């Protein structure tokens, strides 16, 4: 499949002048493999800095996770900062912590600078299902404040019921610097911004080989790019044919999303009066928000190994109705799946495949914001300052136990254990 999946996002995407397919031999400073957020953010930062940039996308801009996700701007990393402190030491934690709110700031700056129409709304809620989770949110607030986020507000059970019309929650952490967007329209807007800055973007141009030479040569079925530098940014949709070493360090995982029919203004505002996005604190979490046209977009669950379930509605609708029983009987207009890339450490993987070939992948569910940080860091590196990129590149990249064969059942067993703990509140 090369066209966008039949999602709400594809149905409501902004129109854009299509990008050509590469059918010739060209040269550039930097060739970026992948037209999702990692590739787009990298290319835009570099184009703004004066680099001659080429982006090669196998399908359409935002085809993968960047055009299918929940659209939530979630700060920080998938691994909490206190765990980072214990795992990697305070010096590394201070460096990583100093960057963990930059991704959202970059997105907001991009939206403003390029007038990207992507339905941005501020504010994100992390909701607690029990007292243990609420205590963890209190700790998270303290930890984030130590690293500079002063836009946090802890809500008790009464306060969260004023923000979300559900009786499931014992409290919440409101991050005023969070928010939500139409993710595919953000990707389209960023691709147009690359073009505006002189970059070249190609769709339907799947990379078949990266030749590790100086300069590097990136080949597609109908053309090739000779580049001083290459950035591999395919993430969960890269596959294992191009740079197979990357596939050994990560695992694609699927998540499922549905979108309701349009709700009345009164009903929509009764559910989430201030139009925040919401995610719970379970290991296998639910996440949801309202769209610009008053639909409820609801996602949840993980399929390890990225197998598409037979019936997305059967999996997700019960979750939606458990949260909002008042929506019983609501029609579901869209349902889809999408893959994200999981790492064993839950930290992003940055690094070098050769002296002039770089990669960034594995945001483990925090890709919307973290990809935009990644683009800034690779641009810094290619401009001569590798310090912040190397703060990530120096982290260990562990393979999943069991290798390619057993990593799925082993990880699923671990997830089942933590999900049971969530249900028991321990």
Curated annotation (Swiss-Prot):
Keywords: NAD, Oxidoreductase. Involved in the breakdown of putrescine via the oxidation of L-glutamylputrescine. One of its GO terms (biological process) is putrescine catabolic process. The gene is puuB. InterPro entries: FAD-dep_OxRdtase, FAD/NAD-bd_sf. GO terms for cellular component: cytoplasm. It catalyses: gamma-L-glutamylputrescine + O2 + H2O = 4-(gamma-L-glutamylamino)butanal + H2O2 + NH4(+). Its EC number is 1.4.3.-. GO terms for molecular function: oxidoreductase activity. It comes from the Bacteria. Pathway: Amine and polyamine degradation; putrescine degradation; 4-aminobutanoate from putrescine: step 2/4. This is Gamma-glutamylputrescine oxidoreductase. Belongs to the gamma-glutamylputrescine oxidoreductase family. Pfam families: DAO (PF01266). It comes from Escherichia coli (strain K12).
């Amino acid at each position: 499949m090369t066209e966008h999946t039949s999602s709400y996002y594809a149905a409501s995407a902004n129109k854009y002048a299509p990008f050509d397919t590469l059918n010739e031999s060209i040269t550039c400073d930097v060739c970026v493999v992948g037209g999702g957020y990692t590739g787009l953010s990298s290319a835009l930062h570099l184009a703004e800095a004066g680099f001659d940039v080429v982006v090669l996308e196998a399908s359409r801009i935002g085809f993968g996770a960047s055009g299918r996700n929940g659209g939530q701007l979630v700060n920080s990393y998938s691994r909490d900062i206190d765990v980072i402190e214990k795992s990697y030491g305070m010096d590394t934690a201070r460096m990583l912590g100093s960057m963990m709110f930059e991704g959202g700031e970059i997105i907001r700056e991009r939206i403003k600078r390029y007038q990207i129409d992507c339905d941005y709304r501020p504010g994100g809620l992390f909701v607690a299902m029990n007292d243990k989770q609420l205590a963890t949110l209190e700790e998270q607030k303290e930890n984030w404040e130590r690293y500079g986020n002063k836009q946090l507000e802890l809500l008790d059970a009464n306060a969260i019921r004023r923000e979300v019309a559900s009786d499931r929650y014992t409290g919440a952490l409101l991050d005023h610097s969070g928010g939500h967007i139409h993710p595919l329209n953000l990707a389209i807007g960023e691709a147009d911004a690359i073009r505006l800055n002189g970059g070249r973007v190609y769709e339907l141009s799947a990379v078949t080989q990266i030749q590790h030479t100086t300069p590097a040569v990136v080949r597609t079925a109908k053309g090739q790019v000779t580049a001083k530098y290459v950035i591999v940014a395919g993430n969960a949709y890269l596959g294992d044919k191009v740079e197979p070493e990357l596939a050994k360090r990560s695992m694609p995982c699927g998540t499922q999303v549905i979108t309701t029919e349009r709700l009345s203004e009164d009903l929509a505002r009764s559910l989430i009066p201030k139009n925040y996005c919401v995610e719970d604190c379970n290991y296998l979490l639910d996440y949801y928000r309202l769209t610009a046209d008053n639909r409820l977009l609801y996602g949840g669950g993980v399929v390890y190994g990225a197998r598409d379930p037979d019936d997305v509605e059967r999996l997700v609708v019960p979750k939606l109705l458990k949260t909002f029983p008042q929506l019983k009987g609501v029609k579901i207009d869209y349902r889809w799946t999408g893959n994200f890339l999981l790492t064993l450490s839950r930290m992003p993987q940055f690094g070098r495949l050769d002296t002039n070939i770089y990669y960034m992948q594995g945001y483990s569910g925090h890709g919307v914001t973290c990809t935009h940080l990644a683009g800034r860091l690779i641009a810094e590196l290619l401009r001569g300052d590798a310090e912040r990129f190397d703060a990530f590149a120096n982290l260990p990249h562990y393979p999943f136990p069991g290798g390619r064969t057993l990593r799925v059942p082993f990880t699923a067993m671990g997830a089942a254990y933590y999900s049971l703990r969530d249900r028991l509140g321990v």
